[in-house]
């Protein structure tokens, strides 16, 4: 009852402050800093909502339902083979659960998927993630989460709430990459609690762990690396004093194999197993760690090191304030004898479960990891570490409590300032992609296939246009596409970089061309 009456209101109040910080960024046109992810997610969900998810085999479709939009691949898949007989393209780089939950949640509430509802849901995920950060610190500190507020856990929660990486990617940006983060945090907490509290044989904990792992794998590939991390740790300790790791091993193996089989089966229904395998191999070449191996060893090594540099840069940019705070703690530990850096066995367990899957993801998917949203996954480790270090300093008495409180407020304010600097308005209009999309929509009839020689059309513009746009270098190529797909009318548009410029160059039809 203490948690409901005192702790929860306090934590929710801190969360509301984080929402207040983000208010200027909410419910505006999608425009920047990976908001193309939100545009892709909403395109999938809106097509399902308008036309019925069952008509697409419950798969993430990227083709609008207008007949003129069929057979057009806009940011859908690499190989071009993930297409059904009706001409619908599908996005299969990730499993589909990240789209399912918001879609069915909005469907239940009779809300059409759109920017603000999805942002609100994403911030709710942010709050739930923070709660499990709080629970994790309580678990590691042997404090009951259901009792009075535990100060160090509150610190970890507050740090997590105001990290620039969580403020943005659990607010404005939503896709599988962000949705899996909540499940990852819950998974780490559940596995850690099974080990620390020795709940290996508890049906409740086994069920909750298996459910979390299954949904994690069904959301994004971080779930696979988490499963691998749990397996390796369990195998290393299966013959130790702590019995029960065989339960974790078999539970993890069964869930991993079942979910991978389900994903392959589901996506193979679109256009066969070979098409799906080809698509995933192509995606791995692009997003994995082996791109440009055909260019020679030295070229590959230079490219690899450049990607590592970018990854390090992303971590510095998102966690520089946290690094400074940890650096201050290290200085205190070195300069004052009564403050020692000692981690318990449970601390090392947490480090393994929270860090190993992220490291594996970066190693095997380096090209993917240089997208800075992958730095989100480290927020669990850094926020819990901040809470534990705060607890160590407080117990040592090396710094007065008042000074620690002022320092915490300073850290939070610095992180908010960093968030504002990273996401401040740039030279491009926030309305740009929306205006371009609306002009594209108004420039073509429902029976006209839209063509353009512009190669850099963003997913945001496609989302606001509610139309697919086919790339063609000229009119002749456009006419060839019309004939190949049995369509008769087309319109060629001129689009320009960084402007809301949309101009109708020419309208044409197969019938009029045949008559000439």
Name these PLM-found stretches.
Residues 14, 154-160, 208-211, 249-253, ...:
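Transmembrane alpha-helix segments characteristic
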Residues 19-24, 163, 223, 389-392, ...:
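Transmembrane alpha-helical segments
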Residues 33, 38-117, 285-294:
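Interfacial juxtamembrane loops and adjacent helix segments
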Residues 170, 177-185, 225, 349-353, ...:
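Hydrophobic/aromatic-rich transmembrane helices and adjacent perimembrane loops
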Residues 190-198, 209, 213, 225-256, ...:
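Perimembrane helix-loop-helix junctions
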Residues 223, 229, 246-327, 358-361:
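Membrane-lumen/periplasm interface segments of specific transmembrane helices
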Residues 227-228, 426-430, 442-476, 480, ...:
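Short periplasmic/luminal acceptor-recognition loop of GT-C membrane glycosyltransferases, typified by
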Residues 235, 313-345, 356-359, 386, ...:
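Hydrophobic, aromatic-rich transmembrane alpha-helices
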